[in-house]
């Protein structure tokens, strides 16, 4: 049995769950999310918690068991608390600022990079070297953070670029000087 899949999903008073056919909809104070379910898992509600069970022990059902448990758990957490990812910008002259709904990044190129957040994602710049990405869909928050980071990944020699908060950049030594 999947160690992740067999754990119950705790439900708060704020989250409301609807299961229609093969679609689960979770709504809460921050918004609502829906996910299409596979026919390999069955969802039941017991003692203010959701349980995800698989229909048989086939390889496909075992693979889907833990996946759908975590997808539903992330939906419940997202509509009640939301998710936030923090990016840090390092480098001389590198900065970020909001221009209306667009994030304007100065990353050492000859032009500014403008990024428009998809619907459901909120971008903030508390200071010039920090970008906060928040939303209710964990996968979308991570995808947007990865997209922004891809504009200038941190390089190993000086550490310049955009990195996740808490990410450790493995540094390299430069070339040794010749005689």
From Swiss-Prot:
The keyword Membrane does not apply. One of its GO terms (molecular function) is rRNA binding. The keyword Lipid metabolism does not apply. GO terms for biological process: cytoplasmic translation. GO terms for cellular component: cytosolic large ribosomal subunit. InterPro entries: Ribosomal_uL6-like (IPR000702), Ribosomal_uL6-like_a/b-dom_sf (IPR036789), Ribosomal_uL6_a/b-dom (IPR020040), Ribosomal_uL6_bac-type (IPR019906). Keywords: Ribonucleoprotein, Ribosomal protein, RNA-binding, rRNA-binding. This protein binds to the 23S rRNA, and is important in its secondary structure. It is located near the subunit interface in the base of the L7/L12 stalk, and near the tRNA binding site of the peptidyltransferase center. Belongs to the universal ribosomal protein uL6 family. NCBIfam families: L6_bact. Part of the 50S ribosomal subunit. PANTHER family: 60S/50S RIBOSOMAL PROTEIN L6/L9, LARGE RIBOSOMAL SUBUNIT PROTEIN UL6M. This is Large ribosomal subunit protein uL6. The lineage of its organism: Bacteria, Pseudomonadati, Chlorobiota, Chlorobiia, Chlorobiales. The gene is rplF.
């Amino acid at each position: 049995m999947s160690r992740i899949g067999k754990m119950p999903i705790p439900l708060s008073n704020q989250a409301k769950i609807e299961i229609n056919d093969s679609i689960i909809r979770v709504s809460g104070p921050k918004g609502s999310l829906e996910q299409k379910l596979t026919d390999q898992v069955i969802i039941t509600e017991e003692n203010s918690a959701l349980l995800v069970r698989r229909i048989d022990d086939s390889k496909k059902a075992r693979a889907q068991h833990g996946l759908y448990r975590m997808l539903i758990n992330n939906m419940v957490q997202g509509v009640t608390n939301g998710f936030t990812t923090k990016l840090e910008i390092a480098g001389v002259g590198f900065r970020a600022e909001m221009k209306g709904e667009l994030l304007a990044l100065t990353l050492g190129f000859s032009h500014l990079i403008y990024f428009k957040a998809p619907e459901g994602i909120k971008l903030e710049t508390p200071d010039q070297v920090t970008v906060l990405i928040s939303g209710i869909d964990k996968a979308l928050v991570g995808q947007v953070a990865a997209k922004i980071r891809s504009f200038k990944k941190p390089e190993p020699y000086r550490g310049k670029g955009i990195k996740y908060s808490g990410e450790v950049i493995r540094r390299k030594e430069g070339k040794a000087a010749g005689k």
